[in-house]
Amino acid sequence: VPFPSNILEAISKMSFSHAMDRVASTRSSAGTLARPTLNLHLDRGRVSITKNSGSNIQNRSDSNGSQHPEPKPFILILLLAVLLGLLAFPVGLQAQELADLKRFIGKNDSILVTDANGQAVLEKNADKKRMPASILKIFTSLVALHYLGDDYRFPTEFYLDDQSNLKIKGYGDPLLISEVISKISQVLAVLLKSSQPLNDLVLDDSYFQQPLTIPGITSSTQPYDAPNGSLCVNFNTVSFKLTSQGYVSAEPQTPLLPFVIKKIKASGLKQGRIVFSHSQNEIVLYAGKLFQYFFEKQGMHFKGKVKLGRINDNNDRLIFRYDSSSSLAQIVVKLLEHSNNFTTNQLLIATGAKIIGPPGTLAKGVTIASDYAKEILNNEDITIVEGSGISRDNRISAVQMNQVLQEFLPYHHLMRRQGREFYKTGTLYGVSTRAGYIKRSNGEFYRYVIMFNTPGKSTNALILRLLRILD
């Protein structure tokens, strides 16, 4: 039973054997007194009580020879009642403090907190489906980890055809960034040293269906609206600023290509970030232009142009396969930390393509996620229309999200950590959510889900109260 440390110290100094000797003795048939005792065991802030039948001792008498009277049974009962009442007090206090938190949960909100055994210690509206916002990323990450494996690495393949065209085929790697492309170009410059000059740089983005439309994604310049594709670089965004010398890249590792400057000028922005779209194949063409820049920086030459095309499996020769330097588990760490919508849906679509077959589509990814919910979570009622939580059409209950957390427990270390808490937050207009784990002193975990679908509410104050109450 949980017990306050100051009272534990006082209890540990008490002699219950002596008290029970005077209060709870009973006469034995041999004319001796059998002395039952209550033993207290203190361990990690908890008290347990055991009763020993005791050994026989000689009946004691006063100096005048009179014997002690036998104790009244009600005295023993009274003492036990007082003890049990004291021991139950902290448990009742914690339960009351948790129950008081229900006042923060409105009709459009939900909360569920369970212990390591799955028993609810706090719940309200837990079976009502809510908009999860970005805590849905936990579910999508779990689906990808289940089907692809935590050490899965996204490939990108490079081919050479008989016309000296260099071809690149993408498979959805969300972390093809400038630093990676620079390293790839160093390898290819060595491998293709005898094949210079090259003709065209051909880009194959057929592993994902194009264009991909994600519910909730708009055509804004915000990074969270970056579209998806199988051959994308730098999250389909470029950061820039305007100086006295003109527009420059805000990231020294990434050049500001003429292809990009034209789009920046059209935006009218002086600084910030632009997002490429599916319009006029911007996404894949930007990837090709960036690869070309780093190839030429390593001394490679192209006589032709950057264009879209396809790999010919019969005639084209695979010369290099780059497997992502980041495992899927490492990608999940980054997407949960930065709440990256682009990366999350890349995982969902790539998982669908891997399991069902290319081309990858959002529908295939959603199908795989739904299959996981049915087969692993034994739940057919999760509504998912995309993987990141940006769509307001996603729906999941606190009970269902708690099931996700139960399965995600082996991966809890991939989440952001703050003290005893491992967590993911979510935010949309009028939506504030938080889900994760609270680690106990004994190493076990509470699982919690908080979903506010009421405008103006935040989960911050509530989680602080939970952390204070829960051991």
Model features per residue range: what roles?
Residues 24-27, 33-36, 41-47, 60, ...:
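Short, low-complexity intrinsically disordered segments enriched in A/P/G/S/L with frequent Arg
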Residues 77-88:
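Bacterial N-terminal signal peptides
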Residues 3-17, 22-29, 35, 48:
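Low-acidity, Ser/Thr- and Arg-rich intrinsically disordered low-complexity segments
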Residues 8, 17, 22, 40-42, ...:
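Short hydrophobic targeting helices and cationic amphipathic motifs
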Residues 131-144:
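Active/ligand-binding-proximal structured segments within catalytic/core domains
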Residues 93-131, 148-154, 187-195, 467-469:
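Beta-lactamase-like hydrolase cores
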Residues 383-471:
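C-terminal soluble interaction/assembly domains
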Residues 97-99, 146-379:
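Conserved serine DD-peptidase/penicillin-binding transpeptidase domain
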